Amino acid sequence: MAFSSGFPFGFFNELVPVYLRSRGTSLELIGLASWASLPWALKFLWAPLVDRVGSRRSWIVACQVGFAAVLAAFVLAEPGGTPFFVLLFAFVALSATQDIAVDASTIELTTKDELGPANGVRVTLYRLAMIAAGGVMVGLSAALGWNRLFLLAAGLFLVLAVVNLRLPTAQRAPAANEPLLEPVRELLASPGIAGVVLFVLLFKLGDLALTPMVKPFWLDAGYSVEQIGWVQTTLGVGASIVGALAGGALTARLGTFRALWMLGGAQALSNLGYYAAATAGAPPGLMYGAAVIEQFTQGLGTAAFLAFLMSLCSRRHAATQFALLSALYRVAGIGAASVSGFLTARSGYATYFLITFALALPGFFFLPAVRRALAARGASA
């Protein structure tokens, strides 16, 4: 399930910027394409439907069939045109719906003590899927062509749909007689929720602001699509897998609170790697080092962050509450990413990467609220 969640995310964040830039799309339009990721932020609006109707497995399989249809349709769409962005929006909407079911299944099938290690494994599979989408597919694009790759990806999702039909689905207590907004009310009534909301909004901001401009930076620095696919994405995402496993283990060992500030601090500092590379003229050593370090620390921080978000959710309302929490940081990230192209075009890559480091810092001011919230829920702090 984690693999099928990671592929769409890798497709959107790793492959699409390379595809658009290699076809001559402007930095401004690539940045604005971040708005197509809005369904990831708004998925809490239909999460109650996923909570109440059907099984987790049925939602996942239906979305995977939808992925196959949309990927096949990309063959007919001009890159950067309106039909392309409509299809991209539909692709993300399917991904967001699938994520609701996958996230809820993870919460329902694990105990709180298992969340750290479970999310380490989950992020690992997620990152492997990102390698498939953003590394293998990008690396093969010159040899096979983009249209053939889209059709191959469509076939992959049909295979995944068949595989997922055989997976177990968690049993959950019915909530049909509860008010529709009960999951939201329960979450908002939690102790210290205001500080928690601000932390969730800001923790991943620097990371999400950085992502849309990384691949254009590689292309504009003179690196080939093959190098981006096989080195920047595959090597980098491979490092993030190691980071995710280490992050899951460290979260279990350190406790969620200490993992958040220690691993989150490493995640923030890693943005300076791309700043150094841009300042020095993008030499291979610094570029490869920046990719590996940024992805490794992203894996560290993400494992701790997911464990924290899941510790805030009740099992009964897992889909809705996790969707609402994840929407918070995605909304902030979309806002930052949407202006990334404009800022980069006007200030240059080096200055923009320095800005993303600054954006990663404000969330740490709200860690005391996080500690209180974890203590109130009996989670490890």
Regions found by a protein language model. Name each.
Residues 169-198:
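Juxtamembrane intracellular "pre-TM" segments in multi-pass secondary transporters
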Residues 61, 65-79, 265-282:
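C-terminal ends and interior cores of transmembrane alpha-helices
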Residues 258-305:
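C-terminal transmembrane helical hairpin of 12-TM major facilitator-type secondary transporters
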Residues 316-344:
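A late C-terminal transmembrane helix in Major Facilitator Superfamily
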Residues 42-55, 242-257, 344-345:
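Helix-to-loop junctions at the C-terminal end of transmembrane segments
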Residues 154-173, 366-371:
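C-terminal membrane-cytosol helix-exit motif in multi-pass small-molecule transporters
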